[in-house]
């Protein structure tokens, strides 16, 4: 097939990006994310992103934050996209140039985010293992956040730090 015709998502692509950021920034992606992004929107003050045995951030999954911080992350991303900052321009370009995945749901993929048509307009969607979704609907200026868990999901102990998140419920 011709380059750019169809996207074949693979987690190793995201992992390669994590290794690249680690090399350029001189720190794990999780630390870079915390210092450069999370510190700007994180209100609860706790996030965790799993690393492999070599210390490389597992960039394709297991970024854990409170629901409030996930919503704040969505708001932050929408503000960045509107302001056309470097980060916002990156995601805008990804949405505008997203490549068809061939999935029956009509999804596309662009620059580390999924793109779905919502009411006829392409919108950025973050999707996680086990049933997490965040839809950034810029047309209505709303964020749809769904945090769920499939009982059949067997990708390690996602709840090893649940106590740190539960502390934020008071």
Region locations from a protein language model:
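Catalytic-site signature segments of enzymes, centered on catalytic residues
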Residues: 1-61
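A structural signal for well-ordered alpha-helical scaffolds and beta->alpha junctions
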Residues: 13-14, 30, 66-70, 87, ...
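Active-site-proximal alpha-helical segments within enzyme catalytic domains
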Residues: 13-20, 59-83, 132-149
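Non-transmembrane alpha-helical segments in soluble domains
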Residues: 18-22, 30-34, 38, 71-78, ...
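Active-site Gly/Thr loop motif
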Residues: 44-47, 91-148, 152-153
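A beta-strand-loop signature enriched in Asp, Gly, Thr, and Trp
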Residues: 48-58, 77-102
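Carbohydrate-binding/catalytic loop surfaces
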Residues: 51-65, 109-120
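Short, gly/Ser/Thr-rich active-site loops of penicillin-recognizing serine hydrolases
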Residues: 154-170
């Amino acid at each position: 097939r011709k380059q750019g015709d169809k996207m074949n998502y693979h987690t190793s692509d995201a992992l390669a990006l994590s290794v690249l950021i680690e090399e350029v920034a001189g720190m794990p992606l999780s630390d870079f994310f915390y210092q450069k992004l999370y510190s700007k929107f994180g209100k609860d003050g706790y996030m965790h992103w799993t690393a492999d045995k070599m210390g490389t951030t597992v960039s394709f999954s297991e970024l854990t934050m409170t629901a409030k911080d996930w919503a704040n992350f969505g708001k932050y991303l929408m503000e960045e996209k509107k302001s056309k900052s470097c980060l916002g321009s990156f995601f805008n370009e990804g949405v505008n140039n997203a490549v068809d995945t061939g999935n029956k749901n009509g999804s596309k993929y662009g620059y580390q985010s999924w793109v779905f048509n919502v009411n006829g307009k392409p919108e950025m969607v973050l999707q996680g293992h086990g049933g997490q979704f965040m839809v950034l609907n810029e047309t209505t200026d709303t964020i749809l956040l769904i945090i769920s868990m499939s009982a059949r999901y067997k990708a390690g102990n996602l709840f090893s730090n649940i106590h740190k998140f539960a502390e934020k419920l008071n």
